[in-house]
């Protein structure tokens, strides 16, 4: 059984007539699996995970057939029941560590707060465990950093502190939302290596939200590609990179600079992602898709399974007779 199973998730901001920012999403993650969610800004990647964590506030609202994590339907859990899971069995590392950390408290206090709440540690054991966590995320001179405030740390150090807080209770699922945003290339590589080492050591599932397809190709076992709030393709690595089945996935891969060597321009799709007031009747990619036919413009395709994953397209690429 999957550790995480999301069925027909929708997220709206406003009333029931509002256009969903996430629409009909199905997604699963197995224990110990590394799943990447990719797509351009505004595709619904972060909102999907915030809905799972219970972080969508009014006027936003969440609906789903179920949001099942480790046997619990997160939609039906009350506040206290949810708090026993979120932050303990399921944790999240946010995009910007400088805003994710509270500037009014030392990093040691913030790590200790997680340990007090979820593990019940007190006194010397609490302090020692906080120190061990800083050492585990490879912060130099960890003992002296316990009493430091977030503004006294670099971006890379702050991200390591955020990771230490997230893994403090040894979660079964860690969600990393653009964990290398605003970090230089060297630090990005170190943070990704750290996350993957922790994932292997603790045998936890990892959901990686990213724009970086190179990172995905090197680290993920499966990929969910999102466009305009929908999952358009789900597949394994490297098959999804070698033989993408959705035109949008193909376009993302073609836009990688290394694939455009010698060209005057990067490969791009014409047009822009549809907004609230210009969503097409049919497939959301149809106004931009080079393969679109009249059927695509009139009806919206469902996400259909095939032997290598799933695709939301009437005329999938590289499949021949594989569609179930």
Swiss-Prot record:
Mutant lacking the gene: phenotype: Deletion of the dppBCDF operon leads to reduced ability to utilize di/tripeptides as nitrogen source.
Q: Which UniProt keywords apply?
A: ATP-binding, Cell inner membrane, Cell membrane, Membrane, Nucleotide-binding, Peptide transport, Protein transport, Translocase, Transport
Domain (ABC transporter) spans 4-253
Q: Which GO terms describe its biological process?
A: peptide transport; protein transport
Disulfide partners: none
Return one GO MF term: ATP binding
Q: Which CDD domains match?
A: ABC_NikE_OppD_transporters
Tell me which domain of life the UniProt entry assigns to the organism this sequence originates from: Bacteria
Has keyword Cell inner membrane? yes
Membrane topology listed for this record: Peripheral membrane protein
User: Would the keyword Translocase be found if you checked this record's keyword annotation?
Assistant: yes
Q: Where does this protein reside within or beyond the cell?
A: Cell inner membrane
List the catalytic activities from the record. Answer: a dipeptide(out) + ATP + H2O = a dipeptide(in) + ADP + phosphate + H(+)
Which major enzyme category is it? translocase
EC number of the protein? 7.4.2.9
Main location per the UniProt record: membrane
- A single cellular component GO annotation: plasma membrane
Question: Where, in this chain's numbering, is ATP bound?
Answer: 39-46
Query: What does the annotation say about its assembly with partners?
Result: The complex is composed of two ATP-binding proteins (DppD and DppF), two transmembrane proteins (DppB and DppC) and a solute-binding protein (DppA1-A5). Five orthologous SBPs (DppA1-A5) are present in P.aeruginosa, which increases the substrate specificity of the DppBCDF transporter.
Q: What does this protein do?
A: Part of the ABC transporter DppABCDF involved in the uptake of various di/tripeptides. Is also involved in the uptake of phaseolotoxin, a toxic tripeptide inhibiting the enzyme ornithine carbamoyltransferase. Responsible for energy coupling to the transport system.
Indicate the family of this protein: Belongs to the ABC transporter superfamily.
Protein name in UniProt: Di/tripeptide transport ATP-binding protein DppD
Query: What organism is listed for this UniProt entry?
Result: Pseudomonas aeruginosa (strain UCBPP-PA14)
What gene is this protein a product of? Answer: dppD
